[in-house]
Design a protein with these regions (language model features):
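N-terminal Rossmann NAD(P)H-binding glycine-rich loop of SDR-like oxidoreductase domains
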Residues: 3-27
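Active-site Tyr-X1-5-Lys
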Residues: 147-177
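Mid/C-terminal beta-alpha module of Rossmann-like enzyme folds, strongest
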Residues: 228-292, 310, 319-338
Length: 338
């Protein structure tokens, strides 16, 4: 029996890999884009069986299009969410579309008789607002978005997932809901319109990051994130589940060293210098990017993905492979010139 799934945000990084895998596994896939002008270029990039993929125009900020996109679907992967390339002036520019878009998708899914929704959240909803130091996080943890210094992006992911879970508990009926919380998503780039999560690798490669501050993050491969979504769509008993999707925590210095070790002359611009904490703190007085970084200095956030490994049998690639594959694809696409 053919299974039909809606993947929201079809032009996005995670969604593209997810669509490819779902089509390969025999699903009939529908996907949303903000404008159908994106359909032709996205189809060309995906290079899948076009008879198994349909596009619909739907925006996180409006009701139009969602009912049509959901009609006949048994499953939904709600992947679409705003991810800015720069810090917004008003946090609500991210919070409102993330929260309201998730609720809009859930309401449309219930009205269409969808059996299960898998929502792409983030470790941003899990591992912030706990103070400085070395921390270990599981799916039981939640970010305290009320703490000072929490960025608009972190607030948006936390508020959106909490709102989605509250709505499902109150209004979802028999519809199942689970969430997947990736860390920083790296891996091969499939488009010149690349995800904001890849900017760090790009800046290291092109030399625009002239020194590494003492910060880091968990890393996960985009292909493994897509795998985890497929597992969550297929597995029984997913109602209420939450899965961290992350590998090990790596400092920027470690990432830079991986690039230099594997790319030879193509990594000649990758910095070998570290920036001292005191200089980051001074820069934060007048530089908004430094201000966003200063609260992360010295922090280690270990996000434990053992639940996904144990419950769903999820398997992950080495972090080094994700970093190198990301870098090589940026170079191959001409997005970075060595």
């Amino acid at each position: 029996m053919s299974r039909t799934v809606l993947v929201s945000g079809g032009s996005g990084y995670i969604a593209g890999f997810l669509i490819r895998q779902l089509v390969a596994e025999g699903w009939t896939v529908r996907t949303t884009v903000r404008s159908l002008a994106k359909e032709a270029p996205v189809r060309d990039l995906l290079a899948v069986d076009n008879s198994r993929l349909r596009f619909f125009a739907a925006d996180l900020n409006a009701d139009a299009g969602w009912a049509e996109a959901m009609a006949g679907c048994s499953h939904v992967a709600h992947v679409a969410s705003p991810l800015p390339a720069s810090v917004p002036k008003d946090a609500n520019e991210l919070i409102v579309p993330a929260r309201d878009g998730a609720l809009r998708a859930l309401r449309a899914a219930k009205a269409a008789g969808v059996k299960r929704v898998v929502m792409t959240s983030s470790v941003a909803a899990i591992s912030y607002g706990r103070g400085r130091g070395v921390h270990h996080f599981t799916e039981a943890d939640w970010t305290d978005a009320s703490q000072p210094g929490i960025s608009a992006y972190i607030q948006s992911k936390t508020i959106a997932e909490r709102a989605a879970r509250a709505w499902v508990a109150a209004e979802g009926g028999a519809m199942e809901f689970c969430s997947i919380c990736p860390s920083v998503v790296l891996g091969p780039v499939w488009s010149r319109d690349y995800s904001a999560s890849l900017v760090i690798v790009k800046k290291l490669l092109d030399g625009s990051m002239s020194a590494c501050p003492d910060i880091g993050f968990g890393i996960v491969d985009v292909r493994d994130v897509a795998d985890l979504h497929v597992l969550a769509l297929n597995a029984p008993g997913m109602a209420g589940e939450r899965f961290i999707a992350s590998g090990r925590f790596m400092k920027l210095r470690e990432i830079a060293d991986v690039l230099r070790a594997h790319l030879g002359a193509e990594a000649n611009k990758v910095t070998t210098r570290d920036v001292p904490d005191w200089l980051v703190r001074i820069s934060a007085l007048f530089n908004p990017l430094a201000k966003a970084v200063v609260g992360e200095l010295g922090n280690v956030r270990n996000q434990d993905a053992s639940h996904a490994l144990a419950v769903l049998g999820w398997k992950t690639r080495p972090e080094e492979q994700s970093i190198v594959d990301c870098a090589r694809s940026l170079l191959a696409l001409g997005l970075v010139r060595p």
